[in-house]
């Protein structure tokens, strides 16, 4: 069994990536399961009734440790797969209590050089990353840049470092927007999505949007989070409330992505932004900050559907250069093939085969 570990079925990119892998591996005949501390969350619908969900019903990580050890010892999985930093640290700290043959694969969702200084208890987390991550059987990165950071700044051995492109279910996305959603007032339609948090930079995006030339342009922001009230107050202060719409969490964000003229990524840090990859799958180009993680690697491969900018004025300039597109036609996917879900799953299957060969 490949046992995935998530706190809950939250609506974040890391959770969606994990569940995409879980479902695809199940569909390809692998034995899979998922441990959660709390069964709630907007992405719970992604897991079919046939996939085992082990709900510890402990709500928080600190209350989950003992139950987590017991459940893993009971299930004896071939692999435990975790993708959130604080959960990664916890699993690595208890691995001495886990079955000896169980492999620990941890996936990092954000660039640690930027995410850790902005995290709670940043000095402690930096120490734990350096001390514990080297004890994983695989440290899975979303980009070459992230892999190089772990090797150079955390002294992690290259032998356990691996790159796994974010898996995007292009087929599901493409059939999910038979009709599109578009907040149209006669100008360019911009779209942004993500947790309403400091990391995602929506506070600065609102200021940039307020400075663009075309005052008929609109901005839709998808997602929920702790800064929602603060961002809505900022919209009123900037006097752009008639041109900005907060949708909240959306089970089908892709119809909004497909209806927009461009996707805006204003993040202060990222690993590989899943929402931007999904926007490309919808045929929608992307404007991104230089801090937006590994997405710049797509640009380096010669892709022209992504514009990386180096500062606020360059972001505004890029926004001003966007043209409205044909609203009545479905645009072809702009996503490179390596990010398709089936290709990412093949990499995991290769790793699983390597385990089998070693055990034979």
Task: Describe each PLM feature range.
Residues 4-62, 153, 225-226:
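N-terminal strand-loop element at the rim of the active site
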Residues 12-20, 188, 192-211, 226-232, ...:
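A conserved mid-protein helix/loop that constitutes part of the nucleotide-sugar donor-binding site
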Residues 69, 122-139:
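Membrane-proximal helix-turn-helix segments that form the acceptor-binding/catalytic region
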Residues 82-89, 108:
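Short His-centered aromatic/hydrophobic patch
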Residues 134-160, 168-170:
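A short, active-site helix/loop in glycosyltransferases that binds the activated sugar's phosphate group
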Residues 249, 268:
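Aromatic "clamp/platform" in nucleotide-sugar-dependent glycosyltransferases that forms part
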Residues 285-289:
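Short hydrophobic beta-strand element within catalytic cores of glycosyltransferases
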Residues 300-313, 320-326:
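Conserved acidic donor-binding segment of nucleotide-sugar-dependent glycosyltransferases
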């Amino acid at each position: 069994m490949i046992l995935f570990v998530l706190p809950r079925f939250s609506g974040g990119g890391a959770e969606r990536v994990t569940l995409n892998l879980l479902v695809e591996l199940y569909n390809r005949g692998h034995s899979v399961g998922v441990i959660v501390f709390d069964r709630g969350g907007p992405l719970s619908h992604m897991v079919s009734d046939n996939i085992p969900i082990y709900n510890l019903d402990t709500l928080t990580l600190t209350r989950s440790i003992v139950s987590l050890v017991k459940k893993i010892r009971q299930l004896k999985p071939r692999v435990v797969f975790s993708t959130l930093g604080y959960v990664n640290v916890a699993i690595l700290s208890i691995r001495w209590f886990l079955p000896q043959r169980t492999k620990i694969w941890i996936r990092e969702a954000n660039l640690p050089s930027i995410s850790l200084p902005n995290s709670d208890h940043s000095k402690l987390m930096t120490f734990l990353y350096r001390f514990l991550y080297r004890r994983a059987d695989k440290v899975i990165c979303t980009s070459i840049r992230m892999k190089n950071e772990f090797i150079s700044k955390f002294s992690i051995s290259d032998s356990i470092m691996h790159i796994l492109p974010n898996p995007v279910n292009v087929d599901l996305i493409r059939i999910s927007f038979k009709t599109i959603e578009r907040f149209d007032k006669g100008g360019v339609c911009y779209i942004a999505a993500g947790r309403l948090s400091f990391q995602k930079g929506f506070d600065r995006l609102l200021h940039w949007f307020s400075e663009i030339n075309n005052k008929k342009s609109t901005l839709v922001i998808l997602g929920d989070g702790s800064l929602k009230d603060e961002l809505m107050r900022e919209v009123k202060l900037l006097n752009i409330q008639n041109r900005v719409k907060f949708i909240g969490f959306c089970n089908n964000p892709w119809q909004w992505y497909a209806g927009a003229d461009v996707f805006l990524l204003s993040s202060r840090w990222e690993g590989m932004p899943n929402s931007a990859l999904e926007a490309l799958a919808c045929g929608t180009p992307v404007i991104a900050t230089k801090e937006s993680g590994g997405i710049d690697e797509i640009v380096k491969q010669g892709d022209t559907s992504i514009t990386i900018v180096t500062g606020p004025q360059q972001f505004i300039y890029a926004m001003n250069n966007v043209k409205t597109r044909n609203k009545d036609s479905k645009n072809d996917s702009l996503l490179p093939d390596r990010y398709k879900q089936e290709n990412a799953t093949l990499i995991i299957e290769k790793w699983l085969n390597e385990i089998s060969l070693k055990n034979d």
